[in-house]
Amino acid sequence: MSTGPTAAPGSNRRLQQTQNQVDEVVDIMRVNVDKVLERDQKLSELDDRADALQAGASQFETSAAKLKRKYWWKNCKMWAIGITVLLIFIIIIIVWVVSS
């Protein structure tokens, strides 16, 4: 029965090795959980920034469309003024030629 006392120290050693491995895995898992939580926080911040950027882009698009329309009308007015001046000039020339 000498196997009883010698088996106990070997068994304790294996149990201690297993416990050390379990502790190591637990530490690794804690680090992994912390990394996942950090990643989640960063993703949340990135999502918020993306939403803000989308809102800014929509506002820019609206402002650009209004500005485009404003300058289109301004261009139309300039063409109308130019055509009116040209017509008045042509009428003056016609009246001057006819009256001469």
Curated annotation (Swiss-Prot):
Known partners and oligomeric status: Interacts with POPDC1 (via the C-terminus cytoplasmic tail). Interacts with BCAP31; involved in VAMP3 export from the endoplasmic reticulum. Interacts with BAIAP3; this interaction is increased in the presence of calcium. Interacts with PICALM.
Record keyword Iron present: no
A single GO cellular-component term on record: plasma membrane
Vesicular side: 99-100
Family from the record: Belongs to the synaptobrevin family.
Regions of this protein lying in the Cytoplasmic compartment: 2-77
Domain v-SNARE coiled-coil homology, first and last residues per copy: 14-74
Chain's role: SNARE involved in vesicular transport from the late endosomes to the trans-Golgi network.
Record cross-link Glycyl lysine isopeptide (Lys-Gly) (interchain with G-Cter in ubiquitin), residues: K66, K68, K77
Keyword Protein transport included in the entry's annotation: yes
Main location: membrane
Membrane topology: Single-pass type IV membrane protein
Matches recorded under CDD domains: R-SNARE_VAMP2
Post-translational modification N-acetylserine, affected residues: S2
Post-translational modification: Ubiquitinated by RNF167 at Lys-66, Lys-68 and Lys-77, regulating the recycling endosome pathway.
Keyword annotations of the record: Acetylation, Coiled coil, Endosome, Isopeptide bond, Membrane, Protein transport, Synapse, Synaptosome, Transmembrane, Transmembrane helix, Transport, Ubl conjugation
PANTHER family registered for this protein in UniProt: SYNAPTOBREVIN FAMILY MEMBER
Protein name: Vesicle-associated membrane protein 3
Organism: Macaca fascicularis (Crab-eating macaque)
Transmembrane regions: 78-98
Matching InterPro entries: Synaptobrevin-like, Synaptobrevin/VAMP, V_SNARE_CC
One GO BP annotation of this record: substrate adhesion-dependent cell spreading
Places the protein is found: Early endosome membrane; Recycling endosome membrane; Synapse, Synaptosome
Gene3D superfamilies: 1.20.5.110
